[in-house]
Each structure stands twice: as C-alpha cells, then as structure tokens.
Amino acid sequence: METLIISNQTLAVLSNKTMNRARVIARRTGSEVMGIIKAQMIEELKARMALEPTKFIARKKDGSIREFWGVTTPKLMKATQTGTGYSGDDVNTVKFWDVQKGGYRSIRYENIIQVL
C-alpha cells in the first residue's frame, strides 16, 4: 500500500516502509515535515548504496558530523555477513558497510543529514 501526501501543490507517493520511517523520524524530531524529508532521503540512500558506494553526511552517536562512504551491494553483504545480525529497519537505523573504516555501521534515521 502506498500513501499520497499533497501539500502546497506537491504530490509524493510513499511506500509503507518509507511512511513508517517518516513516523519514527517525526516522533524523534518533533517535525512531520522533517520526517518525510529524511525518510525520502533514506529511500534514495539505500537504493544508491545497493548499487555502488555512496557518499553521505550524518551525525554520529557522539554528536560529531562525518562524511561516510557506504555500500550495501548484495555481493559485498553476502561475503561479509556472519548471520548473527539484525535488520537495520528493525531498530530504526540504516545499516551499511563503511568503505573507509572497513566495517559495518548503523546510523539512526534522524541523523542522516545529506546524500551527496
């Protein structure tokens, strides 16, 4: 099922997963608009990381801002998975392989700042 959002003559069609992310972000940030914007950004980020390393900016847990190069291509993920992990969406995070640091990372939805 998809949701249509119409605001100021703008139409957005969001999947259920994107709407769920938007609700989580809106609850955490106190802004429905920010929830929708960041949820769409996450959708773009995940789609691009599945194809190639993608550069994005996010706030780390300690509050610092960092540029990341992340990837989730199936071939890499299969080669590096141990089978003991969990889906990032289960805990409202984006999981990815950090190309620069050489390990898995996760970023809370609301901490994604920009996809470059």
In which residue ranges do the predicted regions lie?
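Eukaryotic low-complexity, non-globular regulatory regions
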Residues: M1-I25
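Structural boundary micro-motifs
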Residues: E2-I6, R28-E43, I57-S64
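Catalytic phosphate/metal-binding cores of nucleic-acid and nucleotide-processing enzymes, i.e., regions
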Residues: N16, E52, D62-S64
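Terminal non-globular linear segments
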Residues: M19, I25, D90-S106
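Charged, amphipathic alpha-helical segments
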Residues: R27-E44, W69-G83
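A short, Trp-centered hydrophobic/proline-enriched beta-strand micro-motif
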Residues: A50-A58
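Short, conserved turn/kink motifs that form compact alpha/beta structural patches or helix kinks used as
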Residues: K60-T93, W97-Q100
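Structured surface patches comprising rigid loops and adjacent beta-strands/short helices at the edges
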Residues: K75-M77, G102-L116
